[in-house]
């Protein structure tokens, strides 16, 4: 089971360089399992036992397995994650031609670690909107090949580079794509038109706009002397998306189960398809249109907010509270913050710990050092929007928000096992 899950994760990561591609990958797997698309613009006719999914903006998705039992009796079992990761996004008018090189201006998306982006073989992917035969259409593209690089400045020209380096994203991050002759001008949108023709065999009249991200072309890999680790881009938080998907597909429960994977978590979640938007609430209200029934069902429900946790790094162990240092390959982490940066409380933490014990899955706890600030997740946002009880958990990782992150190769199986048990659980606290 562990090897198959890890192989599936690596394949999923490769197919998902952007939130748009991640959502498409989730859709492909859900449809293969018999899930049917619900269009938000149409009226819905759902049936008990039905399997459905909803997307918004092509970058957020909610998968729903309606139970044979009413949510008024058993509640709804929800797992939440996010599809986006810190990266470099291409600007609207990006062309830069300096010193005979074609470069693209980029904007930093989210709280990225910038130094690891240098000297990487980069490609470009995302969504392109264009006009064809008088109609406006959109399509996903992925160059796949390494088409760009951000070369470092040689240490001979930057003698203090190893003493601390403040990266200027405006001047130092534009990737180099090609050399160009003297007065030659390159039109980036024309390049996108060519890519649409190559990848999808369609002839766009004009590219109108785009949302494109650079990404590292190095594939995810199982590494370490004993294969103890998975090194990959976008583990935060496609690791949790994939774990939630596998658990949902495994769940043969009579209860109603939901997986929600939102975009824009890394930039605050405040969007139409983000966790701070109305997507999940509107979807659940359409399934439970009576206001009284909706509140009753939500108060019987529970959300597991799954987002990676900071594993204790052997070189920087003092960055953790001495009693709360999550270890890689030691199971999922319950995240606690009394200032509500995480939504966990004693009842939801206790229930998750109970599930882990019943499934013989190791479980850990994390609380930030008292002299450091604490990050947050979609957990508190979802809890405050829905009024649903929530526990924040995640798998321990190193190098969070780097272009290449690291997690334990045993932990995915741990998380899938306990989330499957959660979906199958007959009673919630």
Swiss-Prot record:
EC number: 3.4.11.-
Cofactor (UniProt): Zn(2+)
GO process terms (BP): proteolysis
Gene Ontology CC annotation, any one: cytoplasm
Keywords: Aminopeptidase, Hydrolase, Metal-binding, Metalloprotease, Protease, Zinc
Domain of life where this protein originates: Bacteria
Top-level class of the enzyme under EC nomenclature: hydrolase
Record bears the keyword GTP-binding: no
Binding site for Zn(2+): 82, 156, 401
Single GO MF descriptor: metallopeptidase activity
Keyword field contains Zinc: yes
Pfam family, one: Peptidase_M18
HAMAP family listed in its UniProt record: Aminopeptidase_M18_2
Record family assignment: Belongs to the peptidase M18 family.
The name this protein goes by in its record: Probable M18 family aminopeptidase 2
Lineage: Bacteria, Pseudomonadati, Pseudomonadota, Gammaproteobacteria, Pseudomonadales
This protein's encoding gene: apeB
């Amino acid at each position: 089971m562990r090897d198959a899950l890890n192989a599936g994760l690596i394949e999923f990561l490769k197919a998902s360089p952007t939130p748009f591609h991640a959502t498409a990958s989730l859709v492909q797997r859900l449809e293969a399992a018999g899930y049917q698309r619900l269009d938000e613009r149409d009226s819905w006719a759902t049936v008990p036992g039905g399997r459905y999914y909803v997307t918004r903006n092509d970058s957020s998705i909610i998968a729903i397995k309606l139970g044979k039992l009413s949510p008024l009796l058993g509640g709804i079992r929800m797992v939440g994650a996010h599809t986006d990761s810190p990266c470099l996004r291409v600007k609207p008018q990006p062309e830069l031609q300096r010193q005979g090189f074609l470069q693209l201006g980029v904007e930093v998306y989210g709280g990225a670690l910038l130094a690891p982006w240098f000297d990487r073989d980069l490609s470009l992917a995302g969504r392109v909107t264009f006009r064809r035969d008088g109609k406006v259409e959109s399509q996903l593209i992925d160059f796949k090949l390494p088409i760009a690089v951000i070369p470092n400045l040689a240490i001979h020209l930057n003698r203090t580079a190893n003493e601390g380096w403040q990266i200027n994203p405006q001047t130092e991050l534009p990737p180099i794509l090609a050399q160009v002759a003297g007065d030659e001008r390159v039109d980036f949108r024309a390049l996108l038109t060519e890519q649409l023709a190559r990848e999808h065999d369609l002839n766009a009249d004009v590219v109108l706009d785009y949302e494109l991200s650079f990404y590292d072309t190095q594939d995810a890999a199982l590494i370490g002397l004993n294969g103890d680790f998975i090194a990959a881009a976008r583990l935060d938080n496609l690791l949790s998306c994939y774990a939630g998907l596998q658990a949902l597909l495994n769940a043969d429960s009579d209860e109603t189960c939901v997986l929600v994977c939102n975009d824009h978590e890394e930039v605050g979640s405040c969007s139409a398809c983000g966790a701070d938007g109305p997507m999940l609430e509107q979807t659940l209200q359409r399934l439970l249109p009576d206001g009284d029934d909706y509140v009753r069902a939500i108060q019987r429900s529970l959300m597991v907010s799954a987002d990676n946790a900071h594993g204790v790094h052997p070189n920087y162990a003092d960055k953790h509270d001495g009693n709360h240092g999550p270890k890689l390959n030691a199971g999922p982490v319950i995240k606690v913050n009394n200032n509500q940066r995480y939504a966990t409380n004693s009842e939801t933490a206790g229930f998750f710990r109970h599930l882990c014990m019943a499934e013989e899955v190791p479980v850990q706890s994390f609380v930030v050092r008292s002299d450091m600030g604490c990050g947050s997740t979609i957990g508190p946002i979802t809890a405050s929007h829905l009024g649903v009880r929530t526990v924040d958990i995640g798998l321990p990782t190193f190098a969070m928000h780097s272009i290449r992150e690291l997690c334990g190769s045993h932990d995915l199986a741990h998380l899938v096992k306990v989330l499957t048990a959660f979906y199958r659980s007959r009673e919630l606290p």
